[in-house]
Amino acid sequence: MSTQETTEGAPGARDVRLVAPGFAELTIRPEDGCRISSLIINDLEVLRQGDRYGSFPMAPWCGRIELGQFRSFVTAPGGGDEAGRSGGVRHQMPINATPHAIHGTVRDQPWRTATVDDQSATFYCDLTDPWPYRGRVTQTFELTDDALTLTMGVESRGDSFPAQAGWHPWFLRQLGPTGAPVQIAFDPAWQEERGVDHLPTGRRVEPGPGPWDDCFGMPDGVDVTLTWPTQLELTITSGAQWVVVYDEQEEAVCVEPQSGPPNGLNTVPRLVTPIDPLEVSTTWRWKRF
């Protein structure tokens, strides 16, 4: 492991690097939302570079929340939220993907380092405003010669609340200037029908061909393989049952394992309680050709 001062992002931020010598190098930026800024496998960078890219954690929700609002049947600390007509308390998150709120809050927060060694590291951040409930999110990285395992936990530090967790990696479409475009292979059980507002309608339909900006159900766990012909194969697995696949950008594709679908805080809420935290993990396993 090494740390290094960097002039990008937050002033004084330190990168954390995990190394499997001769095989892989992972760079994490704790003060920039605990984002992975680089994953190099056998001298090939596989993630799109830039402040918005790499791979970032999504919590306490994934994807879009309709109009930035969700309801909870637990009173928020400090009050001040409106009671909805259909019951519960309505909370308003900041709109950052008009007219919705997208991808959670922790990607915009600095994280603290808990433990670091040569090939693993753990970080955490506390849930704060605008999220109305006290809690903590923890993320662990474990690097080996042929795999990276990410684990994220969301825990309550007070009242119970609905939550989701997942990851949003931006994989390069081509590895190097002469590489062939990546191929995406997966076999979902269904596709969440997407409305004109980019939210699932609630209907499950037969999976269709790309290009995609869509959520898919994989009840036996996420299993998606990316293949860069003659260069690299990378398989993304997770016990999570939903994955968003986005391949509409020329430079990169996204495969996002997550614990629930977009707008899931409203449609399929998973309650985090003081005795029942949410935990999700994903493993990216690779082999060179």
Regions found by a protein language model. Give the residues of each.
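Extended, loop-rich substrate-binding clefts of extracytoplasmic carbohydrate-active enzymes
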Residues: 1, 8-10, 81, 95-144
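Beta-strand-rich N-terminal accessory domains
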Residues: 1-89, 220-239, 276-289
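Beta-strand-rich interaction surfaces with strong enrichment in secreted/lumenal proteins
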Residues: 68-70, 138-140, 268-273
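A short, structured loop/turn motif at beta-sheet edges
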Residues: 71-77, 114-120, 142-147, 175-179, ...
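Acidic, contiguous internal or C-terminal segments within carbohydrate-active enzymes
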Residues: 125-169, 174
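Active-site/ligand-binding surface loops and adjacent short beta/alpha elements
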Residues: 158-162, 169-239
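Glycine-rich active-site loops that engage anionic ligands at enzyme catalytic sites
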Residues: 226-262
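C-terminal structured interaction module
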Residues: 256-289
